[in-house]
Design a protein with these regions (language model features):
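Local sequence-structure signature of Cys/Sec-based thiol-disulfide redox active-site neighborhoods
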Residues: 1-25, 29-34
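Thiol/selenol-based redox catalytic cores and closely related redox-interacting motifs
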Residues: 36-117
């Protein structure tokens, strides 16, 4: 089986629940605290491709950083969105679970089963 990574924030219930589902399935993923180890622009592009989503679809529009910095004006500009994700990593949707060339957002946490089945 390919290694599994999780972009994780232990402060958030969905992230903890997704991690627990992986562990309950006897999978110990590589845990990346994306707030401390912020993905590079190349990593963000790769994640976007693996999710098969434009970055505007996996940012948290309800986050303070998103609202306070008027980031909505960049929804059609991938580079500016990636730059914003690097500068304000809290706007990155979480958790993101990656396996090989596929990734899912663990909202709801059970989405992880589509990746590990």
């Amino acid at each position: 089986m390919s290694e599994i990574l999780i972009l994780h924030n232990s402060r958030w219930g969905k992230s903890r629940a997704t991690l627990q589902l992986l562990r309950d399935s006897n999978i110990e993923p590589i845990i990346i605290n994306y707030l401390l180890s912020v993905p590079s622009i190349d990593e963000l592009r790769s994640i976007s491709k693996k999710l098969n989503l434009h970055p505007s679809r996996w940012i948290r529009k309800s986050e303070k950083d998103y609202k306070n910095n008027n980031l909505g004006k960049y929804l059609n500009d991938e580079v500016k969105l990636y730059d914003a994700m690097i500068k304000y990593p809290k706007i990155i949707e979480r958790p993101i679970v990656i396996k090989g060339d596929k990734a899912i957002i663990g909202r709801p946490p059970e989405n992880v089963f589509t990746l590990i089945k």
